[in-house]
Amino acid sequence: MASMAFTLVGAFKGMSLSSPCHSSSSASFLRADRVSLSVGGGVGMGVPMTMPVRRLTIQMAHKKGAGSTKNGRDSPGQRLGVKIYGDQVAKPGAIIIRQRGTRVYPGNNVGMGKDHTLFSLIDGLVKFEKYGPDKKKVSVYPYEKQPENPNSYRARKREYFRMQRERKKARAEGIVEVQLVLAAADESPEVNADC
């Protein structure tokens, strides 16, 4: 049938960076040169067509989108890590750990967010525990307040400062403090001398 003859005119012309016909420093294949197509079977039946060649340019929405090797160097940290440590009190919904991936697994009364953030589900104490040979988990246990020893240093110190505040307040209001006065016993003759 009809044979197709393709002639590429000027497609590879001027492959060097400095083209003699253009003062631009880009190669001709980056410019919009035209490709000539000849379609037809006979000698005089070919219909020459010219189609523009598209430029081979890379277009990005932003200048940082092109993938420069210098991008992302001075970016701030993500504030990851432990936020509430072991034996500290956590309220419901308080973030215990922010992490990438599951470095620490959730234990009792601890939930995990979609970004692997661990948070407390109840009010209680945070405890870090081993979970298998090489894993860790964090749990929150209900907080029971232990009764304090009244003779401990902390309790005596608290009581001492409470008494000091009361004395200072009484002095400021002008209330006379009751003081013990030692009275001397009067030796009177009516007292029984047999004693």
From Swiss-Prot:
PROSITE patterns named in the record: RIBOSOMAL_L27 (PS00831)
Annotated GO biological process: translation
Primary location recorded for the protein, binned into one broad class: plastid
Record-annotated membrane-spanning stretches: none
UniProt KW Ligase keyword: no
Transit peptide boundaries: 1-60
Cellular component annotations (GO), alphabetically ordered: chloroplast; ribonucleoprotein complex; ribosome
Signal sequence residues: none
Keywords assigned by UniProt, alphabetized: Chloroplast, Plastid, Ribonucleoprotein, Ribosomal protein, Transit peptide
Keyword Ribonucleoprotein assigned: yes
Localisation: Plastid, Chloroplast
MF terms in GO: structural constituent of ribosome
The family this protein is said to belong to: Belongs to the bacterial ribosomal protein bL27 family.
Assembly and binders: Part of the 50S ribosomal subunit.
Name of this chain's protein: Large ribosomal subunit protein bL27c
Organism: Oryza sativa subsp. japonica
